[in-house]
Design a protein with these regions (language model features):
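Alpha-helical linker/hinge and terminal dimerization helices associated
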Residues: 50-51, 71-93
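Hydrophobic hinge/microswitch elements
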Residues: 137, 217-262
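Hydrophobic two-helix hairpin corresponding to the core of helix-turn-helix DNA-binding domains
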Residues: 17, 29-30, 65-68, 239
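Secondary-structure junction motif
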Residues: 193-217
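Central regulatory/effector-binding core of bacterial HTH transcription factors
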Residues: 95-159
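A late-sequence structural motif
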Residues: 264-301
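Short helix-boundary/capping micro-motifs
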Residues: 18-34
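A short LG(V/I)-centered, amphipathic sequence patch enriched
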Residues: 48-66
Length: 301
């Protein structure tokens, strides 16, 4: 086991902390590390003593505290740099795929982000682990050290991360023509208060934000929850309710007459950003370049 200290912290202890967080329990971490559970417990306690902080909540699954998140992020960054160095030196294991974890919002996944992955050169040898999360919350996964990069609506960089604007995703207030004729025939502020609405999940605030722009406290309480981007759009096209549809998904359905934009002057733009660890990592650099190129081709400037 490598025990060289980084900034005074023994790497075996930091790696053990990461294993406990990833595996969820001390016993599972011991199995993954091929050591005894007592060795895992001793390493974590030694690290907590060295830092003077409680690093884990002893729950099931185990969760890092705010201080623990800093060290989890450190452990993942060290692992990333080790794999890059191994690949550059052609050492044993250099041919193994490199795993890159990214947090992405559902609408980006459904419209443009997968295209970015196909732009990454195959010789980079990357395997992607995507975590779907609302664009307002993806930065939290970066902060926790759960992912290396994220598509986020936040322009404020997470500590230790760089940020660049990708472009604007436009959302259009849409409904099926039949639904619009039945429920949306009148001033938007009046009809939106009563018309059934489709929302992604209970954290989806897009439709309520649209209603607030019209001077309403929220959209109708008659709402359908459809927690996939494709299903959300299909539910609106099927006439279940109205909703804010990403422009790339709305365009073909508007052209086909399956959707109508019932308030064209009230589109909503969300500026998306790319945040990633501030590391000199070829793997992250290749992904960031592909993401920027695809976003430029898909999103509004």
């Amino acid at each position: 086991v490598m025990t060289t200290a980084l900034a005074g912290l023994p790497l075996d202890q930091v790696r053990t902390l990461l294993a406990v967080v990833d595996e969820g329990t001390f016993d599972a971490a011991a199995t993954a590390l091929h050591v005894t559970p007592s060795a895992v417990s001793q390493r974590v306690k030694a690290l907590e003593k060295r830092t003077g902080r409680v690093l884990l909540t002893r729950t099931k699954p185990v969760r890092p505290t705010e201080s623990g998140e800093v060290l989890v992020r450190l452990a993942r960054q060290v692992a990333r740099l080790e794999r890059d160095a191994t690949a550059e030196l052609g050492l044993s294991g250099a041919g193994e795929p490199t795993r890159v974890s990214v947090a992405v919002n559902a609408d980006s996944l459904a419209t443009w982000f997968l295209g970015a992955l196909t732009r990454v050169p195959p010789e980079a040898g990357l395997c992607f682990e995507l975590r779907r999360e609302d664009e307002g919350h993806t930065a939290a996964l970066l902060r926790e050290g759960a992912v290396m990069a994220a598509v986020t609506s936040s322009p404020d960089p997470v500590p230790g991360c760089s940020v660049r604007a990708l472009g604007r995703m436009r959302y259009l207030p849409c409904a099926s023509p039949g639904f619009a004729a039945r429920h949306l025939d009148g001033p938007p502020a009046e009809v939106i208060a009563r018309a059934p609405v489709v929302v992604f999940d209970r954290r989806d605030d897009f439709q309520d934000a649209f209603a607030r722009r019209l001077g309403l406290p929220s959209a109708s309480r008659a709402r359908h929850h459809v927690p996939t981007s494709e299903g959300f759009v299909e539910a609106i096209a099927a006439g279940l309710g109205w909703g804010m549809v990403p422009e790339p998904q709305a365009a073909p359905l508007l052209a086909a007459g399956r959707l109508t934009d019932f308030a064209p002057s009230l589109a909503t733009d969300i500026t998306l950003h790319w945040q990633q660890w501030r590391l000199d990592s070829p793997a992250l650099a290749a992904l960031a370049e592909a993401v920027a190129e695809t976003a430029t081709a898909t999103l509004r400037p």
